[in-house]
């Protein structure tokens, strides 16, 4: 049964302050690392809402040629990390951004028992929502960030 009335119980999303970004922040960035928790194999709704507001940047081509990478966290190893990373990448491809992943030259990628994918960095938080990265996750996350920074500097 669906109610005819709806009452907001959560506060509205703030319009400014960390970790929130504006369209001007995106327009002026030299590279973008975009992250979201996984929600049923997709990015979280607030990030989707924000990306849906970037049409003016898409129309102007403001993000074309800028490097970007994506990262996520899930509660379980098979919680939808790769589909989440892909769902975050699709709008960035539409913007003409240069998506960076993790190559298998990083041996941790093929040996990890926790997070890490070629599509982007990931973390398995577990059912206890552990915020601490495993050694493999930390190494791969730093490698992706380093890769993004290196490419952004080369393109600047």
Protein language model regions, located:
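Glycine-centered flexibility motif
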Residues: 31, 79-80, 100, 120-121, ...
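Short, electropositive, low-hydrophobicity segments enriched in small/polar residues
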Residues: 35, 39, 45, 69, ...
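Short, glycine-/small-residue-rich phosphate/pyrophosphate-handling segment
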Residues: 64-117
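Short, flexible, mixed-charge acidic loops at enzyme active sites
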Residues: 8-9, 112-124
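N-terminal beta1-alpha1-beta2 submodule of the flavodoxin-like/Rossmannoid cofactor-binding fold
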Residues: 1-62, 124-156
């Amino acid at each position: 049964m669906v109610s005819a009335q709806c009452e907001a119980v959560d506060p509205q999303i703030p319009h400014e302050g960390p970790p929130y970004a504006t369209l001007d922040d995106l327009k002026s960035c030299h590279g973008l690392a975009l992250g979201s928790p996984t929600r049923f194999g997709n990015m979280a709704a607030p990030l989707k809402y924000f990306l849906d507001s970037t049409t003016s940047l898409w129309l102007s081509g403001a993000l074309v040629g800028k490097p970007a990478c994506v990262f996520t966290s899930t509660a379980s190893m098979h919680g939808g990390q790769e589909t989440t990373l892909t769902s975050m990448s699709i709008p960035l491809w539409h913007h003409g951004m240069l998506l960076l992943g993790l190559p298998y030259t990083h041996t941790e990628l093929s040996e990890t028992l926790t997070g890490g994918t070629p599509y982007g960095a990931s973390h398995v938080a577990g059912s206890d929502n552990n915020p601490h990265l495993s050694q493999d996750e930390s190494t791969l996350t730093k490698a992706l960030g380093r890769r993004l920074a290196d490419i952004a500097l080369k393109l600047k």
